[in-house]
Each structure stands twice: as structure tokens, then as C-alpha cells.
Amino acid sequence: MAAAALPPRPLLLLPLVLLLSGRPTRADSKVFGDLDQVRMTSEGSDCRCKCIMRPLSKDACSRVRSGRARVEDFYTVETVSSGTDCRCSCTAPPSSLNPCENEWKMEKLKKQAPELLKLQSMVDLLEGTLYSMDLMKVHAYVHKVASQMNTLEESIKANLSRENEVVKDSVRHLSEQLRHYENHSAIMLGIKKELSRLGLQLLQKDAAAAPATPATGTGSKAQDTARGKGKDISKYGSVQKSFADRGLPKPPKEKLLQVEKLRKESGKGSFLQPTAKPRALAQQQAVIRGFTYYKAGKQEVTEAVADNTLQGTSWLEQLPPKVEGRSNSAEPNSAEQDEAEPRSSERVDLASGTPTSIPATTTTATTTPTPTTSLLPTEPPSGPEVSSQGREASCEGTLRAVDPPVRHHSYGRHEGAWMKDPAARDDRIYVTNYYYGNSLVEFRNLENFKQGRWSNMYKLPYNWIGTGHVVYQGAFYYNRAFTKNIIKYDLRQRFVASWALLPDVVYEDTTPWKWRGHSDIDFAVDESGLWVIYPAVDDRDEAQPEVIVLSRLDPGDLSVHRETTWKTRLRRNSYGNCFLVCGILYAVDTYNQQEGQVAYAFDTHTGTDARPQLPFLNEHAYTTQIDYNPKERVLYAWDNGHQLTYTLHFVV
């Protein structure tokens, strides 16, 4: 059967030979040499490959044909690879592996079948083309891509139809909510109208009963004033005389004027101002306990008060101070002083015979010894009330204990920082989520923070790194990522206000907390201002050359001064977190264990250090931020995605 099948083979090739015979082709065409290519494949993420081919020369082919071959007459294909993850391979087509045999094959074809030379040439051409282009593999890839595109198209159609249904349901639900809201708005409008009508009726009744009330109030006040005068005649006779010469009928006159104004306003149907009654009550309840007359002029007192009010740049002097004692003003009939009373009314404490020393921010300086005066706040302060003298007295004490933390919210990632501006009068909260980024999120207050309702988002021009940022006096202070630069970003005008370089800081990618890419540069704010804490080289100890440096910064230009810079004995890799209170640096020994200690303290006032060994609880065992807020006297902490505060106790 095999012998019978052999004869038809030349007949099958004859038509192809006849078709190719119409084109003249030379046997030594250069097309064959063009197809001799080396193919290289590489696999791996880090790979560099190189193929080196050494073919036989024409002289070597002639020597091999004549039987005079040498040792160096051979061809090779070498593969050279480099890289940690690399696999290389080099291959070559048959025409390139043995050029001598290729020439012998061509000569045999010329001698035995000249008509098949053209066919062999075309076969070699097609073989080289298929080998170099790898058309079958390309076809397989194209088919696979086409099938993936079809699958993707079907899934997109299904998802779009499903999302369209969700959007339609949402629009329908929002329309229903809008109708309910409109109904509630109409009800609220009716309630407001009813309340306005009732308020107008009550106002008219009060206006009708007003003429009898001031007479009684004036009489009782006159009796109280007369009784107070009778008690003080023996002690302050001369003062009473000088004070009586000035006259006291103004408060009743003002009361009558207010009653007449009340009648006019009630006739018009308007509402009373909410501040009118409290001022009148304050005047009626005043009790004169005694007077002291000084020769200092009114202008000198006013100038001294203004000068002392403007002294100091610390945030503590912007807070309303505590008020101890109760007294009346020096000139109750002064109209200018009545106008200035809601802002800051001067009170003199004369309960005892001698002047009493009261912590205050405003003192009256005259030629004779004067009692200390203080400002009366018009509304209850939101935070602790500390004056400049009280601040210095409180900072003389040291930290006695740290209470267990109070959790306020769980927000964001495991690492982050949250803070308040201690120099601000509002309760805005600022959050940096994670230890690397360029966004600062602002919340109006703690309730909005718990609800996730942010009020502002700041996109910074340069990325921050770490969790040691602070917000102070309306600016965000942070360390620029992967540099030794510190930046002050103005939050109100949204631009970089200052830029400085810490030349002696030791900056590396690894940190004492072993957070990837975290920064060792830590900002802090205490009662005295802005500070920066960073590691530097210690020339005194070669075994442990890196120590923690504490320096007070100028908030304006971020400058560092030698007289306000201290090198501590705290080593860089020996603590977890640190914070600054009243000019004393405290360091917690661990951050990833629940039971920790405040193991180190450095006092900048004396230049000495100590080991207080105070218990400190890392409740969630991953504390990435601890910062002191001098306005609230608490520590703000970020522990494994939980926002906490610690209450501090001091030894005064």
C-alpha cells in the first residue's frame, strides 16, 4: 500500500511548480539571508536577556566540505541573562543553525531538480515568516481577547440595566421624601405664625402692666442703696460725700426711658430686644459694698487698661479670665462705661480692707497703690479659664497622673491624627487619615465629626507624612514627605506661608514605631507656643548617636534659635510616643501594648530629666498619635482607628 501511494506525489507538486515557474528567482537570492533571525523569549519581573550567535563562516564551510575541518569550526547560540527573577531562552531557525548544510542542500537541488529550487525557496520563506511572526500564537491571543470583550459587553449590559433600576428607585424615593418635607414645611410655617401671634399678645399685656413695675423696682432699689449708704457712712464718709456729689438718679431715669420705649414698641407690635432686660436686671441687683477714691484721671486709667489688654501673644490671654469677688464700677453714671460693659467691665474687689491679689490679664497702673482689676466675661467660656499669671502658676507643677482614655469616635484607618486649634475660639476638629497624604479634613464640631459631616477639605500642595502634625493659630504645621523640610500652611488663605529646613535632623525611612515611611519629626503645642521634636546626632555618645532634640519654633517663619533648643537624653528608638506639657517633654515607653508608662520626662526650665513611671493605658494597643491641647488640658490620641482623649492631673 505504501509503494502504491508513492508515485502520485510528484504529480501533486507539479501544478505548484508550474505556477511558480513564471517568476524568475535566483538561487543565491539574499531573501534567504534576511530570514535568518534569532528568537528570544524572557519571563520574570526583573529580567534582562541577550542572545549571542556565532555562525560558521564561508571558509569554515569549505573546510568542512573538503574534510579539513578545524577545532574552531563550529557554530553556537548562547543565552546571557541577568536579574533576580529571570528565565531566558534563545532559538534560531534551521537555516541559521547550519549554513553549510543549507548551501549543500541548495547545490543538490540545482543538480537534481532545478525546477524544485523555486519551490524550496518559497518554503523557506514561508517557514521563516511563520517562525518569526508566530502567527498561530497571535491568532490565539486575538481569539481570546475577542471572547473576553464579548463577555465584558454582556456583563456591562446586565449591570447597566440593574443600575438603572436602582437609580429609578432612588429618584422615586427622593420624590416621596420631598413631598413629605413640603408638608412638614407647611406645618412648621403655621406653627411659627401661631407663635408670633401669641408672642404679640403677651407683649401687649406686658406693655400694659409696665407702668406699675418700674415704680416698685425703683423704690426698692432706692431703699437698698440708702441702707448701703447708712452702713458705709462710718467707714467711707468722705468717699460717700464725693460720690454723692456725682448723683445717682441715672439708673431710674434709664429705666423710665426703657418703659416709654417699651410702650412705643408694644404699640407698633414689635418684639423686645433680648439684651434689654438682662442689663436692667444687672443694674437692679448691684450692691454697693464700698468705694475707694483715687486722684488718677480717667484718661490714665483707660490708657493703662488698653495697654495691658494688648500685652501678650499667647492664646491663654485671649480667653476670658476667671472673676473672683463682686463690686461696682468706679463711675456708675458714666455713659461710656455702660456702653463698654458688655465687652469688658472693670470691677474693683473691696470686700476686705486691703487689696486682694486676683489672677487677671488687665491691671490698673497709677501713682498710688491700686487694687487688681479683672475682666468680667459676658458669656460662660467654652474651655478652661486660665490667665497669664495662672498659666505660669499651673506650669510650675508636674504631671501627677493620666486618667484612662475616653473614646469619642471610631473613624478612618489604623493610623492617623486628630486635633483642635488651641488658639481658636471655636471647636473645629481637623483630621489627617493615615500617615501619608495631602488632604486635611475639617469638621465644625465633635457632633459633626461623629456624624461624618465634614465642613471643609484642604488639598495641600505638598504631601505630609507621619502623624505629628498640629493646627495652631489658623495654620497647619507638618513635615513634607520624604524630606527634612517643615511647612506652615495658612488654612484661611490656602497657601504655604512659611518653609524651613531642619539641617541636623536624622531622617530615615525606618522609625521607632516601625511604620513604613513614617516621619520622626513631631510638632507640639503647649502653653508657651509651638515646638518641634526630632532626632539628631549626638557627638558625645558614639554608641547611641541619635538623641531627641526639643526646640521652640517661631510660628511666623519657623525659625529655630539656639537658646530655645535642648538636647535630651532620650534615645531615638527607646520610646513609643511623646507629648509636651508646660515646657516638659514626656515620653511613653510603648505604643503597641495596653499597659504602658510615662517613662521619661525632660524639663526645659531646669534642663534636667527624670523617670516618673506613671501608668499609661493604650486601650487598643496601637497608639499612633498623642498630642496635648493646652486650651482643654487634655491629650488627643489616635489608637487603632479610635479617637480618644486623656485627662491629666498635676501636682501644683
UniProtKB/Swiss-Prot annotation:
Expression tissues: In the kidney expressed only by podocytes, wherein they localize to major processes.
InterPro entries: Olfac-like_dom, Olfactomedin-like_domain
Biased composition (Basic and acidic residues): 224-234, 243-254, 340-349
GO cellular component: extracellular matrix; extracellular space
Comp. bias intervals (Low complexity): 209-219, 352-377
Signal peptide annotation: 1-27
Disulfide pattern: 395-582
Sequence ranges of Polar residues compositional bias: 326-335
Keywords per UniProt: Coiled coil, Disulfide bond, Glycoprotein, Secreted, Signal
Matching Pfam families: OLF
Post-translational note: May be cleaved at Lys-295 after secretion. O-glycosylated but not N-glycosylated.
PANTHER family cross-referenced by the UniProt entry: OLFACTOMEDIN-LIKE PROTEIN 2A (PTHR23192:SF29), OLFACTOMEDIN-RELATED (PTHR23192)
Complexes and interactors: Homodimer. Binds to heparin and chondroitin sulfate E.
Protein name, per record: Olfactomedin-like protein 2A
Annotated source species: Homo sapiens (Human)
Origin organism lineage: Eukaryota, Metazoa, Chordata, Craniata, Vertebrata
